Amino acid sequence: MSTILESLPTGQKVGIAFSGGLDTSAALHWMKLKGAVPYAYTANLGQPDEDDYDAIPKRAIEYGAAGARLIDCRAQLVAEGIAALQSGAFHITTAGVTYFNTTPIGRAVTGTMLVAAMKEDGVNIWGDGSTYKGNDIERFYRYGLLVNPDLKIYKPWLDQTFIDELGGRAEMSEFMNQAGFAYKMSAEKAYSTDSNLLGATHEAKDLESLESGIKIVNPIMGVAFWRDDVKIAAEEVTVRFEAGQPVALNGVEFKDQVELLLEANRIGGRHGLGMSDQIENRIIEAKSRGIYEAPGLALLYIAYERLVTGIHNEDTIEQYRENGRRLGRLLYQGRWFDPQAIMLRETAQRWVARAITGEVKIELRRGNDYSILSTKSPNLTYQPERLSMEKVASTFSPRDRIGQLTMRNLDITDTRDKLRVYSQVGLLTPGETSALPQIKGDGDK
């Protein structure tokens, strides 16, 4: 039996992830008029552009919800965000600038916590505002069914009747006004924005064109660092970790991780830190483009990565990075709680993060321009005296190095033999000015 309902289940409880915006407001009232019994569930994710969460469930009741609940997801959101940071679960980068998977993390939290609340209320049908071309429809589908195996999915935006009657924002606004709610449609922006406490995503509309850049975006978590009229003074900040957990900023300890991240957002936001412009592959493998903000996570990540490189050896760091990229992709796909993801997370949190204790001082300037000023940790394996060019007690002698280099003769000989084989089969051609052969181009005869 299909878990996806293509038409409204009249007479039944239908839970809707309710943001209070035009789309979900119109959908909720429409479902009520068509005979369903809507229940509204709002996730408090600490969105920087939402200033009155308590009013949202009240509006849902006004629009016809049989019940409305506000679910505080902030602590869980930050916990999952720090777990992603500890694991390096970020696979989308451009020239070293990282997207911190803030929307996928938010969906993992929303998709599980809201469905758990619905299950408590005996609501086994769930709807949300995700469209069929995006990533969220699959993320919510997976997380919802993980929590409630009896869950059915009803999405108004997949119901042709709803689309025919309320297919656009103008129609939705008119529908709400005719119902007596005096709903004033907000002015259309040149792009859409989705946010939570970890970060913000700006995409679609004008940003679908690669000829439009970051300069059309109005940041909601920081400053437009590219504008000459925005004055940004350099600022030094210290970040301290204990056993992989961020615990202090500028010497101030935080017992509450939510408060720590809020302060990290304020510090990083003053500089526009953590903004990036990325082209990515959606779950369905179509490319999309987004401009992202994550000032707090970016600040913590700089310090965390610095300590990782100062504490762990090369092979551990390599495994951490490779696993992190794989884990980031799983997170992006809505598989954050799948066994293979848990395995990768636990490995990084146990064997990488727990050794990360120390303090890093960073100078922040404009955007992602920063300098690391100092690094302190009782666990550092960085010992400059081992490699000092001064006359100091050394862990090895010149004669030891001669022996080590002599042992390299075997693999150098092996490489030379392989190059000769490649030349014999026509893959390489002898160099004219070098003893080394040259790679043949496709046009070479």
From Swiss-Prot:
<comment type="subunit">
    <text>Homotetramer.</text>
</comment>
<keyword id="KW-0067">ATP-binding</keyword>
<dbReference type="GO" id="GO:0005737">
    <property type="term" value="C:cytoplasm"/>
</dbReference>
<keyword id="KW-0547">Nucleotide-binding</keyword>
<feature type="binding site">
    <location>
        <position position="139"/>
    </location>
    <ligand>
        <name>L-citrulline</name>
    </ligand>
</feature>
<dbReference type="GO" id="GO:0005524">
    <property type="term" value="F:ATP binding"/>
</dbReference>
<feature type="binding site">
    <location>
        <position position="192"/>
    </location>
    <ligand>
        <name>L-citrulline</name>
    </ligand>
</feature>
<dbReference type="GO" id="GO:0004055">
    <property type="term" value="F:argininosuccinate synthase activity"/>
</dbReference>
<feature type="binding site">
    <location>
        <position position="135"/>
    </location>
    <ligand>
        <name>L-aspartate</name>
    </ligand>
</feature>
<feature type="binding site">
    <location>
        <begin position="17"/>
        <end position="25"/>
    </location>
    <ligand>
        <name>ATP</name>
    </ligand>
</feature>
<feature type="binding site">
    <location>
        <position position="99"/>
    </location>
    <ligand>
        <name>L-citrulline</name>
    </ligand>
</feature>
<feature type="binding site">
    <location>
        <position position="43"/>
    </location>
    <ligand>
        <name>ATP</name>
    </ligand>
</feature>
<feature type="binding site">
    <location>
        <position position="136"/>
    </location>
    <ligand>
        <name>L-aspartate</name>
    </ligand>
</feature>
<dbReference type="GO" id="GO:0042803">
    <property type="term" value="F:protein homodimerization activity"/>
</dbReference>
<protein>
    <recommendedName>
        <fullName>Argininosuccinate synthase</fullName>
        <ecNumber>6.3.4.5</ecNumber>
    </recommendedName>
</protein>
<dbReference type="GO" id="GO:0000050">
    <property type="term" value="P:urea cycle"/>
</dbReference>
<feature type="binding site">
    <location>
        <position position="280"/>
    </location>
    <ligand>
        <name>L-citrulline</name>
    </ligand>
</feature>
<feature type="binding site">
    <location>
        <position position="131"/>
    </location>
    <ligand>
        <name>L-aspartate</name>
    </ligand>
</feature>
<dbReference type="Pfam" id="PF00764">
    <property type="entry name" value="Arginosuc_synth"/>
</dbReference>
<dbReference type="InterPro" id="IPR014729">
    <property type="entry name" value="Rossmann-like_a/b/a_fold"/>
</dbReference>
<feature type="binding site">
    <location>
        <position position="131"/>
    </location>
    <ligand>
        <name>ATP</name>
    </ligand>
</feature>
<keyword id="KW-0436">Ligase</keyword>
<dbReference type="InterPro" id="IPR024074">
    <property type="entry name" value="AS_cat/multimer_dom_body"/>
</dbReference>
<dbReference type="InterPro" id="IPR018223">
    <property type="entry name" value="Arginosuc_synth_CS"/>
</dbReference>
<dbReference type="GO" id="GO:0000053">
    <property type="term" value="P:argininosuccinate metabolic process"/>
</dbReference>
<dbReference type="InterPro" id="IPR023434">
    <property type="entry name" value="Arginosuc_synth_type_1_subfam"/>
</dbReference>
<feature type="binding site">
    <location>
        <position position="135"/>
    </location>
    <ligand>
        <name>L-citrulline</name>
    </ligand>
</feature>
<dbReference type="InterPro" id="IPR023437">
    <property type="entry name" value="Arg_succ_synth_type2_subfam"/>
</dbReference>
<comment type="similarity">
    <text>Belongs to the argininosuccinate synthase family. Type 2 subfamily.</text>
</comment>
<keyword id="KW-0055">Arginine biosynthesis</keyword>
<dbReference type="Pfam" id="PF20979">
    <property type="entry name" value="Arginosuc_syn_C"/>
</dbReference>
<feature type="binding site">
    <location>
        <position position="201"/>
    </location>
    <ligand>
        <name>L-citrulline</name>
    </ligand>
</feature>
<comment type="pathway">
    <text>Amino-acid biosynthesis; L-arginine biosynthesis; L-arginine from L-ornithine and carbamoyl phosphate: step 2/3.</text>
</comment>
<feature type="binding site">
    <location>
        <position position="194"/>
    </location>
    <ligand>
        <name>ATP</name>
    </ligand>
</feature>
<dbReference type="InterPro" id="IPR024073">
    <property type="entry name" value="AS_multimer_C_tail"/>
</dbReference>
<dbReference type="InterPro" id="IPR048268">
    <property type="entry name" value="Arginosuc_syn_C"/>
</dbReference>
<keyword id="KW-0963">Cytoplasm</keyword>
<keyword id="KW-0028">Amino-acid biosynthesis</keyword>
<dbReference type="InterPro" id="IPR048267">
    <property type="entry name" value="Arginosuc_syn_N"/>
</dbReference>
<feature type="binding site">
    <location>
        <position position="129"/>
    </location>
    <ligand>
        <name>ATP</name>
    </ligand>
</feature>
<feature type="binding site">
    <location>
        <position position="136"/>
    </location>
    <ligand>
        <name>ATP</name>
    </ligand>
</feature>
<feature type="binding site">
    <location>
        <position position="203"/>
    </location>
    <ligand>
        <name>L-citrulline</name>
    </ligand>
</feature>
